[in-house]
Amino acid sequence: MNTKTTVISQAELDAQFACCDKVAAYWQTKGRTPTAYVETYGCQQNEADSEKLRGFLAQCGYAIVGSAEGADVVIMNTCAIREHAEQRVFGNLGALTHTKRRHPEQKIFLCGCMAGETKVSDRVRHSYPHVDGVFSTHHLWQFPQILWNVLSGKKRQFFIEDEPGSIAEGIPQVRDSSLKAWVSIMYGCNNFCTYCIVPYVRGRERSRQPEDILAECRALIEGGTKDITLLGQNVNSYGKDLSCGMDFADLLAAIAQIPGDFLVRFMTSHPRDASEKLFDTMARYPKIAKQLHLPFQSGSSRVLKAMNRHYDRETYLQKVNYAKKVMPELVLTSDVIVGFPGETEEEFEETISLIQSVHYASLFPFISPPRPGPPAAKMDDPTPKDEKNRRFDRLCAVQNAISEEIHNSYIGKTLRCLVDGRDKDLLTARTEGGRLVRFPGRDDMIGTYQNITITAATTWSLSGKAADIC
């Protein structure tokens, strides 16, 4: 089932910008520039959302600062994927009690995926009276109104009602980087994996119109952006709720044909919807990075079925093998869950054998049990924690050896890399496949592509020498 996607009207957005003007006027009467701090937890989509929050704050006249201490506004943009992350948020939220005691006029807001959980908003309402507002991801576009309501003396704000199907275009953004950019192409997820809470807190899949995405990408490229990452909980489902007939491969091809010197990449891909058409498109266009994050989660078909992943081991391997055939230089990464409820030792060994077969450049492993809420939390889970930790350690050892082997294969090769910063006395850069490279160089190289010859490698990164530096 696809939710009908609606776009927030210009009149509704104008009302939000009017609230920005009211907030700015409020601070003008105070005779000083207000400050704001945004703390982001979790995934790249949350990072993109925080850029929009900072955009609204800038429109309201706030200067962005790097600490909650003394800030006039504090926003905690939260993640609900792991229970540990939620507990960390509550701990930090509690610590803000002392910050607000020192600065009584400070306004504190909680947003993001946690805010979409009724139990979280209820807990904040009753146990964290110093928090001035809670709003879910569906209400991010209404933040100026929420902020103005608080500043003008209205009661605590709770914008948490489920509002699926809405997309807001034209929200200002203050991006973290001028070189790299996140571009959200869709929101929500329809897959309902049994361990995942995302569909419950971010809603069903909603795709942005292709012309809006293309316009955003063109503006970024014209402004000097060199690396664009397209974001979605499942980018491969893009367009299924639109009437234009454009799927994700079509969108990717259209972006790759925009004039300019840049790369486009994407995350996250669900194997269920990854197609040969997508892989052929990636192979065809040089501006599409030959990097693919394709989470397999388990090497056991039985466990995959219990996860409600909609594919089996054989299907996953067929797709990966085709992708590697048409893109021999492809850099593959993945997520994997260790100790899913009911996973046997034999099924864990199937995961190990898949890792050894595919040869991922890196993995992002997680230990089950799943967080409370999704169906997997209620499954029988007889495997002791110590055994799960043992499996986790073994998996990491296997993957670390593979990562080091892959990185060692780069030694002696010259790779085109985007130089993105400095780490102490070395510059840092990223290969087309997303590998970290450190090398000696000049600051004027930052923001440019450089040909770097790899001279050394570790499990986690590469070292090299720029071609134009002897």
Functional labels for PLM-detected ranges:
Residues E105-L110, E117-K119, I221-E345, Q356:
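Conserved SAM/AdoMet-binding glycine-rich loop
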Residues C193, I213, L230, F266, ...:
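Conserved, mostly hydrophobic/aromatic
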Residues M1-Y238, K277, E314-K325, S353-S357, ...:
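Proteins enriched for Cys/Gly/acidic motifs involved in redox and nucleic-acid/cofactor modification
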Residues E343, E350, V358-Y360:
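Contiguous mid-protein beta-loop-alpha structural module that forms a pocket-lining wall or clamp
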Residues D176-L179, C189-N191, I288, S298, ...:
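Short flexible coil/turn linkers enriched for glycine and charged/polar residues
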Residues A80-I81, R202-G203, L242-G245, K305-D312, ...:
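Short glycine-enriched, charge-decorated loop/helix-capping segments at active-site entrances
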Residues M1, T6, A376-C470:
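Terminal RNA-binding accessory module
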